[in-house]
Amino acid sequence: RGRFAYGFTDAMTWTNKNGKRMRLWMPEETEIGDPQDFMDQLVDNIVKVVTEPIDIHVNPTYLPAEIADQYDALWTDERIDRMVKALAENGVALEINNRFRIPSATIIKKAREAGVKFTFGTNNGGADDLGRMDYAIEMIDACGLTPQDMWYPEG
């Protein structure tokens, strides 16, 4: 009987405190309300997700289009630290996503300092995504990532 080499998931589909099931990449299904409250709920959800038996948190730090232009302001040090701590404590790697150009260099640097490992991904949203690693390469340079910072499947 075979096994998967690794497991990954994201926090882009969840039910908010009002009971609304959301897919964050679909504006018609997303309910933001107060952006600060939304972010607190999102980080709570990310922390829950990375306690599951997964290896990689993908599409990390993704924000819906409605608030994406507030990324740096909404991803506060406190929120970053909560997420990074959960990743480190659970041994979950963080994807550097070329399609969405996330997470930010600030987040990557904090995660690296905490011992979090990294992977690269594209989200395979279309032909333009495949084989593109421009953002990952940019972050390798900007954050001083080395092969030792990368996540590798066991076995």
Q: Which residues make up each language-model segment?
A:
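Extended substrate/RNA-proximal surfaces in nucleic-acid metabolism proteins
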Residues: 1-89, 141
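Charged catalytic cores and adjacent phosphate/nucleic-acid-binding surfaces used
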Residues: 71-155
